[in-house]
Amino acid sequence: MKNKIFLAAILITPILVLIVSSLYFTFGYSPEGTKNNGVFFNSYFNFDQFKQSEEKNLIDFEDGKWVMGVYITNPIKSSDSLYLMRQLNVALNRDIYRVKRVAFYSNLLLEEEVKELISIYPRTELIIDESGRLLNTLQNNAQIDMHDENPIFIIDPYGRAVMYFSPGTDPKKILKDLKVLI
């Protein structure tokens, strides 16, 4: 008799958990806010809208990797973001190949400085945003000045910009967010 009660308790527990969680969801009880350390963009935007030419997209998402990106407007300020991006990629350990690093720039006057900066950080893809539309879109959807701050932003494998990390955010917290996302 004691074993039957124990068996019934084990079998009923998962069903009870599902029922209670469904009721909480139905009646609107949910956690307030998020535990993300990054800042979500005001609206999601897709990178398919940024084309370099009629056939060529700004960046390809065929490989199914997440993208850590930096838009370089000031090579000195962006060097900190590029360094942090490399360190975060290394800290991902076994997930290192699920993320690629990309640097964008549009100011052709900075081309030599940018290429010299990127040479310090191997495995970072450099992409020219010829029209500058990406920077404008980032600026319009962010709460900080993307032109001055040069923060790291995250793009999902489907090409949607998800979030960015304000300068000064603790790298351990950024790494924690990346591990949750990936």
Language model features with spans:
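N-terminal targeting signals for export/organelle localization
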Residues: M1-K51
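Short active-site neighborhood of thiol/selenol oxidoreductases, capturing the structured segment around
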Residues: I59-S78, Y83-M85
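Short loop/turn microsegments at loop-to-beta-strand junctions
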Residues: K65, E149-P151
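Structural beta-sheet core signal
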Residues: M68-V70, R101-F104, I154
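Short, charged/polar "capping" segments at the starts of alpha-helices
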Residues: K77, N107-V114
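Conserved helix-turn-beta segment immediately C-terminal to the redox Cys motif
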Residues: L82-V102
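Short, internal strand/loop/helix patches
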Residues: V102, E113-E149
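Thiol-/selenol-based redox modules, centered on thioredoxin-like
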Residues: I154-I182
